[in-house]
């Protein structure tokens, strides 16, 4: 029991030291990511109404790549002034349909039949 507690304390102390004396570029990079995420959230809060924001957060749990595409689309529309009012849930559904159509993958099935030597023609009776 004492060994486990000692090991936990060592890990905690090591984590503190790494955080304190860690790579300064890493901390700056994390700060930049944090600021970017904060900026995205503030723009989306201005552009989306409450129900659309809830739908987008639910979608983020299931399909994060599609959510990122929709967020980028909304931010781009907001920057270019193409949104005259807040996007409702129905508007978000329409945008989701557009993004789905653009990223839709078509699957094709290709049959590769084996060519078998037919020995019926060569039968000598």
UniProtKB/Swiss-Prot annotation:
Region (Disordered): 16-36
GO molecular function: acetyltransferase activator activity; beta-tubulin binding; DNA binding; heparin binding
Recorded superkingdom: Eukaryota
Species annotation: Homo sapiens (Human)
Positions carrying Phosphoserine: 51, 119
Keyword Acetylation: yes
GO biological process: apoptotic process; cellular response to transforming growth factor beta stimulus; negative regulation of chaperone-mediated protein folding; positive regulation of apoptotic process; positive regulation of gene expression; regulation of apoptotic process
Protein name: Programmed cell death protein 5
Assigned keywords, A-Z: Acetylation, Apoptosis, Phosphoprotein
Residues with PTM N6-acetyllysine: 63
Gene designation per UniProt: PDCD5
Tissues/organs with expression: Widely expressed. Highest levels in heart, testis, kidney, pituitary gland, adrenal gland and placenta.
N-acetylalanine modification, residue list: 2
Family: Belongs to the PDCD5 family.
One Gene Ontology CC term in the entry: cytosol
Xref: Gene3D superfamilies: PDCD5-like
Lineage, broadest ranks: Eukaryota, Metazoa, Chordata, Craniata, Vertebrata
């Amino acid at each position: 029991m004492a060994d486990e507690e000692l090991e936990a304390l060592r890990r905690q102390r090591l984590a503190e030291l790494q955080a304190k004396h860690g790579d300064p570029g890493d901390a700056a990079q994390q700060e930049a990511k944090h600021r970017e995420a904060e900026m995205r959230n503030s723009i989306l809060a201005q552009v989306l109404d409450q129900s659309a924001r809830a739908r987008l957060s639910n979608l983020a749990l299931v399909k994060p790549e599609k959510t990122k595409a929709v967020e980028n689309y909304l931010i781009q529309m907001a920057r270019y002034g193409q949104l005259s009012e807040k996007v409702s849930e129905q508007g978000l559904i329409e945008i989701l349909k557009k993004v789905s159509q653009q990223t839709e993958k078509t699957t094709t099935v290709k049959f590769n039949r084996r060519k078998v030597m037919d020995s019926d023609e060569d039968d000598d009776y």
